[in-house]
């Protein structure tokens, strides 16, 4: 039995609802598809105002860097079309865990790999944390 299965059958808790699973997948789709389509409204729906998006990587000179992006920067970047050049890519979504109003999702495209944490708010599921890296063969050093 995996940790996820144990969490799903813990006393007083049941498996995640199909509605929650669908809503989490829709949130992640809004995040990526909003980015690729230049749709700031979809991005705004997907990210929590307190979003902490980070990437730990190396710049062109191999200097370690920490890149941080806010919810406003993601929304404005999407609306400005910053992700359109990478549109049409595949999107793989794997929900790793759901419980107690939080979820963990592994998502990837041809260009990005993200570890996402979501919270269930009165407005629905939203991404509160995102740790990302470039997919193999992409990014500034590709």
Residue locations for each model-derived region?
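Residue-identity detector for glycine
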Residues: 14, 34, 38-40, 77, ...
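Short, low-complexity N-terminal intrinsically disordered segments enriched in polar/charged residues
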Residues: 1-41, 45-50, 61, 66-68, ...
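Surface-exposed, charged secondary-structure patches
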Residues: 20-23, 52-112
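Solvent-exposed, well-ordered amphipathic alpha-helical segments
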Residues: 35-36, 46, 73-75, 88-91, ...
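Compositionally biased, intrinsically disordered low-complexity regions enriched in proline and serine
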Residues: 32-33, 57, 113, 126
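Short beta-strand edge/turn micro-motifs at domain boundaries
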Residues: 2-3, 104-106, 113-139
């Amino acid at each position: 039995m995996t940790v996820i299965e144990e969490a799903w059958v813990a006393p007083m808790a049941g498996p995640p609802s199909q509605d929650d699973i669908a809503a989490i997948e829709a949130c992640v789709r809004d995040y990526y598809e909003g980015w690729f389509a230049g749709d700031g409204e979809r991005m705004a729906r997907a990210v929590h105002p307190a979003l902490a998006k980070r990437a730990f990587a190396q710049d062109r000179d191999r200097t370690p860097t920490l890149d941080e992006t806010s919810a406003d920067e993601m929304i404005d970047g999407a609306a400005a079309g910053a992700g359109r050049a990478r549109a049409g890519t595949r999107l793989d979504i794997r929900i790793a865990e759901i419980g107690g109003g939080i979820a963990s999702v592994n998502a990837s495209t041809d260009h990005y790999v993200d570890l996402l944490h979501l919270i269930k708010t009165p407005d629905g599921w939203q991404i509160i944390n995102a740790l990302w890296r470039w997919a193999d063969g992409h990014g500034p050093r590709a």
